[in-house]
């Protein structure tokens, strides 16, 4: 199943602005996905920067167009750097996005993520288990893996969006993007996207970058989800497995032409 025509039309419009702006996206992400995240942003036309030292993270967050905080490989020193960057982004009105990886499993990162929410992220992106845990409705999951369907976490996402006044994305076979008042659903993608490390983390970076665009934040974030779903489908069609999927996915993002996809579907 592909994203519907309305979503793809919206995504085509947003992608033009995204590539024209090439948002400078400050990624404080986990060690496992640094390269894949940077390459995903580059393939779409953004400008990634992986600045992680506390001395540099604070001033850089103020000049970037967007900031991503991904707690996948959180340490005490990295938490200090992330907090400094978020405080700087908050003061500079730089939109920042939280990816609360495995927040329902480990207490240190759960408390850290909850503490950061007071600094008003523009967006939160997680799987169902992570969103349920962050909203205080359940604890669990299997590390980075979800034990819940995305739809089951939609009420939690809507409550969290209302509480924080932000966009919340719950990802799965169907992605749900909500600001509590409106909710958009984006089907598509391919199961191969779950057989490599980093597609969710990379999506969070693209969501962060999309928050730098003018216009309706909900539509911009939904467009980011649509781009990734379309690229995942295209890559799967010419891949034999996870090893060939990764380069095919980056190529699909680079060559993504949503208008052409709209014309042929």
Swiss-Prot record:
GO terms for biological process: thiamine biosynthetic process; thiamine diphosphate biosynthetic process. Its cofactor is Mg(2+). Its EC number is 2.7.1.50. Gene3D superfamilies: 3.40.1190.20. Substrate binds at residues 50, 198. NCBIfam families: PRK09355.1 (NF006830), thiM (TIGR00694). Catalyzes the phosphorylation of the hydroxyl group of 4-methyl-5-beta-hydroxyethylthiazole (THZ). This is Hydroxyethylthiazole kinase. It comes from Salmonella paratyphi A (strain AKU_12601). The gene is thiM.
């Amino acid at each position: 199943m592909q994203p519907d025509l309305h979503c793809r039309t919206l995504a085509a419009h947003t992608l033009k602005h995204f590539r024209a702006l090439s948002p400078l996206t400050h990624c404080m992400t986990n060690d496992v996905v640094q390269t894949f995240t940077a390459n995903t942003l580059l393939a779409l036309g953004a400008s990634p920067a992986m600045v992680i030292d506390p001395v540099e993270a604070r001033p850089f967050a103020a000049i970037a167009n967007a900031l991503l905080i991904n707690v996948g490989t959180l340490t005490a020193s990295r938490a200090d750097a992330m907090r400094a960057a978020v405080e700087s982004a908050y003061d500079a009105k730089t939109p920042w996005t939280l990816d609360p990886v495995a927040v329902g499993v480990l207490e240190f990162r759960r408390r850290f993520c909850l503490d950061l929410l007071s600094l008003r992220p523009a967006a939160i992106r997680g799987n169902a288990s992570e969103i349920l845990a962050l909203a205080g409705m359940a604890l669990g999951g299997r590390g980075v893996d979800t034990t819940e369907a995305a739809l089951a976490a939609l009420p939690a996402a809507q409550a969290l969006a209302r509480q924080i006044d932000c966009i919340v994305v719950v990802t799965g076979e169907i992605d749900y993007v909500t600001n509590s008042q409106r909710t958009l659903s984006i089907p598509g993608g391919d199961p191969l996207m779950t057989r490599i490390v980093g597609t969710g983390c990379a999506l969070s970076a693209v969501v962060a970058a999309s928050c730098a665009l003018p216009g309706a934040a909900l539509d911009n974030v939904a467009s980011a989800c649509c781009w990734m779903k379309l690229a995942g489908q295209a890559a799967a069609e010419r891949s034999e497995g996870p090893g060939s999927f990764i380069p095919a996915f980056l190529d699909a993002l680079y060559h993504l032409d949503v208008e052409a996809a709209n014309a042929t579907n």
